[in-house]
């Protein structure tokens, strides 16, 4: 039986290249549709594909044709209604389109072209041109650590790693292959010798010749070595990179009593989008979740998004905890440190200057990028204005934006993490 091994990268999906070419050609249409989908979807529902509609007029191929100017004289066979010199009116409406117009009895057109993009394609367009700013300290953590793992069988290796079973199996197969014809001749000679001894026991000449042939064949088979260097098989051990994280993102969320349920929902949606962005685009990043009201606490992902704990408001408690964790686990000399903070701006009045002091002296000199989003439809309060002073002192590594509704999340997110041009 014959086997066909398909080693093509696309496998059975032979249209992958054409699909990628199509996505590149209509990138602007798809990107616009993805942005509209993000604005109407729940952030929790981002990991799905999307149905894209492209106007029919935009998928027409360019062709060379005669212009509409000039004069033409055409004779139409069977023409009983018009005479030479009369003008033929254009067909009336009724062309194809979105389907919202009234019915027509003439004209033609083309419906919009609708197709589906996959989850991976949707996320690619969603996070296109986004990145963590100032990611520059990749080399400071030193060489990656490695772990030794089994990687199959090799023909060369350390004698201490010889695989006895595979070696003997290979030697046995080699002997069978190389002595197959000799063994077949030996069996025939042994049958012939048995026949001669029964039927012609006095034919000593032929019996002696057959016995000599048998001895010669046995000697040929025995000359083949039991074990050859070709048979040796070794367990292959390779070093697999076990990379350490190069970057850490601190997520600080205000869960105080001043945060309404709608405000908390917007904050959670923002952090879910951020978490999805980090996990998709960066394999080597750690995320630290900090919730705070009057006191701050480091929590896991589940508790960060779904805990119902609440209380008063002291924002500096979260900043102090972040600074402590940085000093203990993430030295700035080895890590790219990022932070995203979400709050409604309400804070104990005497605490806002403390926040600015902690940020400007203990955090901002060590982070690559710090972003603050304030979720409020009202006028800004003291915390916003204190943070504005931080932005003036650190214009390249600090950014702040305001969120009013859930529809602002994606545009603000793109504004905060838009890819910067190298300077």
Swiss-Prot record:
InterPro entries named in the record: UPF0229, vWFA_dom_sf
Pfam family, one: DUF444
Domain of life assignment: Bacteria
Region annotated Disordered, chain positions: 85-107
Biased composition (Gly residues): 92-107
Stated family: Belongs to the UPF0229 family.
Protein's name according to its UniProt entry: UPF0229 protein PputW619_4806
